[in-house]
From Swiss-Prot:
Location of the region described as Immunosuppression in the Swiss-Prot/TrEMBL record: 380-396
Function: This endogenous retroviral envelope protein has retained its original fusogenic properties and participates in trophoblast fusion and the formation of a syncytium during placenta morphogenesis. May recognize and induce fusion through binding of SLC1A4 and SLC1A5. Endogenous envelope proteins may have kept, lost or modified their original function during evolution. Retroviral envelope proteins mediate receptor recognition and membrane fusion during early infection. The surface protein (SU) mediates receptor recognition, while the transmembrane protein (TM) acts as a class I viral fusion protein. The protein may have at least 3 conformational states: pre-fusion native state, pre-hairpin intermediate state, and post-fusion hairpin state.
Motif annotated as CX6CC, chain positions: 397-405
Topological domain spans for side Cytoplasmic: 465-538
Organism from which the protein derives: Pan troglodytes (Chimpanzee)
Record-linked SUPFAM superfamilies: Virus ectodomain
Protein name, entry field: Syncytin-1
Regions of this protein lying in the Extracellular compartment: 21-443
């Protein structure tokens, strides 16, 4: 039996595509031994001065850096150590870690948040991301027959990982040790989004340092960046020969390690700036201190979690859309014709946008209907194929022992509705095109006209009222002045005094009548004329 062509080609070409494992990494160091921090307890509660344990000479120790900039090497090749891939290359820049001309190793990926400037670490990460995306696309786009809902993957996703359970248990144990209330009912929550680790400085009095550190691999470089640092006081700080900041008041203890690479026990890190290190190469310009790293967990009591999840009801009402539109129209009326024009243009623009949205909705309905029609066609083809395959047993329905289902195509109703929507859209577009912004103003005239009469009367009264009032005042004043001028001669004739002749007998009554109403000056001038008669009579 002859093999198919593609199977034969695969069997022939398979040996040529066999991948070979990368060579072992040759980044071992045995001439200069590494040092490790060890704390020994002088008595419970106090930490003695640190001592150092050196590896014996000849002990091979693998050293790799976590970050290597692109300008530090010409080329890099893959190597393997302890079933882990690393990059190896020769240093060409004296300022890079390792030294000029030294062959060093560094990790396959750099840590999150850093870039090597387009080097092999960035390229490896980009390649890995593309592979994951293509794999997900291939899995989700594969056309497989429907076999019901497969919830096994969902169950695997929802199943809690063992390391996560261990992390929660450790956090709860630490909470019971440090909390005075010893809470029994609480919630320990992890954020779904990425958040940086939290740095907690190692206290001055702590008696849980490990005395035995067995390691054959050293990672030089930052492990975590962008830390959240808490309680920056009473720190145990580390200074090197090139450390400049040695007057920090937050440090209560300074430790000077040797010039060789210094590593810390598991669970303790050097924090320099906002980055965490497991090992330092004996030089650091910034101040470093010893710290723990914990995940960004949040601990809630039952009441706190209830208050956080269940928000308090708000008394603020949501404004109703017609009320908002009415308020805009009244505001336009209050600000005059300019406000009305602005409001009208705004509503015209809003109407145009709504018309465009309606067109997009119609297009979406047509697209969905086309997809449904194509899906229905595929289903009908599959049904015919199944009927042909199971024709000897009576067709698909008899073969499955189920009721037969038939597809009733009602796409014509959707097509008619879409046609009606398109006709309405076209009529509305023509109305908007013919009327324009000022045409919409005519639609508002039945509501505006009742207000125009009183408004015009008030405006006319304010404009011409002062002039009319001034004219009335001037007219009344002129008439009063004319009346005064006419009455002035009569008043002068009434005040004139007539002299009585000498041969006329004196009458007391007449004298009184003559001088009655006369001014005092005229009476005084008239008195000498009356004295001779009075003397003669006496």
């Amino acid at each position: 039996m002859a093999l198919p062509y593609h199977i034969f080609l695969f069997t022939v070409l398979l040996p040529s595509f066999t991948l070979t494992a990368p060579p072992p990494c040759r980044c071992m160091t045995s001439s200069s031994p590494y040092q490790e921090f060890l704390w020994r307890m002088q008595r419970p509660g106090n930490i003695d001065a640190p001592s150092y344990r050196s590896f014996s000479k000849g002990t091979p120790t693998f050293t790799a850096h976590t970050h290597m900039p692109r300008n530090c090497y010409h080329s890099a090749t893959l190597c393997m150590h302890a079933n882990t891939h690393y990059w190896t290359g020769k240093i060409i820049n004296p300022s890079c870690p390792g030294g000029l001309g030294v062959t060093v190793c560094w990790t396959y990926f750099t840590h999150t948040g850093m870039s090597d400037g387009g080097g092999v670490q960035d390229q490896a990460r980009e390649k890995h991301v593309k592979e994951v995306i293509s794999q997900l696309t291939r899995v989700h786009s594969a056309s497989r027959p429907y076999k019901g809902l497969d919830l096994s993957k969902l169950h695997e996703t929802l199943r809690t990982h063992t390391r996560l359970v261990s992390l929660f248990n450790t956090t709860l144990t630490g909470l019971h040790e440090v909390s005075a209330q010893n809470p029994t009912n609480c919630w320990i929550c992890l954020p779904l989004n990425f958040r940086p680790y939290v740095s907690i400085p190692v206290p001055e009095q702590w008696n849980n340092f490990s005395t035995e550190i067995n390691t054959t691999s050293v990672l030089v470089g930052p492990l975590v960046s962008n830390l959240e640092i808490t309680h920056t006081s009473n720190l145990t700080c580390v200074k090197f020969s090139n450390t400049t900041d040695t007057t920090n008041s937050q440090c209560i203890r300074w430790v000077t390690p040797p010039t060789q690479i210094v590593c810390l026990p598991s669970g303790i890190f050097f924090v320099c700036g906002t980055s965490a290190y497991r090992c330092l190469n004996g030089s650091s310009e910034s101040m470093c201190f010893l710290s723990f790293l914990v995940p960004p967990m949040t601990i809630y009591t039952e009441q706190d979690l209830y208050n956080y999840v269940v928000s308090k009801p708000r008394n603020k009402r949501v404004p109703i859309l017609p009320f908002v539109i009415g308020a805009g129209v009244l505001g336009a009326l209050g600000t005059g014709i300019g406000g009305i024009t602005t409001s009208t243009q705004f509503y015209y623009k809003l109407s145009q946008e709504l018309n465009g949205d309606m067109e997009r909705v119609a297009d979406s309905l047509v697209t969905l209907q086309d997809q449904l029609n194509s899906l229905a066609a595929v289903v009908l083809q599959n049904r015919r194929a199944l009927d042909l395959l199971t024709a000897e047993r009576g067709g698909t329905c008899l073969f499955l022992g189920e009721e037969c289902c038939y597809y009733v195509n009602q796409s014509g109703i959707v097509t008619e509705k879409v046609k009606e929507i398109r006709d309405r859209i076209q009529r509305r577009a023509e109305e908007l095109r013919n009327t324009g912004p000022w045409g919409l103003l005519s639609q508002w005239m039945p509501w505006i006209l009742p207000f125009l009469g009183p408004l015009a009367a008030i405006i006319l009264l304010l404009l011409f009222g002062p002039c009319i009032f001034n004219l009335l005042v001037n007219f009344v004043s002129s008439r009063i002045e004319a009346v005064k001028l006419q009455m002035e001669p009569k008043m002068q004739s009434k005040t004139k005094i007539y002299r009585r002749p000498l041969d006329r007998p004196a009458s007391p009554r007449s004298d009184v009548n003559d001088i009655k109403g006369t001014p005092p000056e005229e009476i005084l001038t008239a008195q000498p004329l009356l004295r001779p008669n009075s003397a003669g009579s006496s």
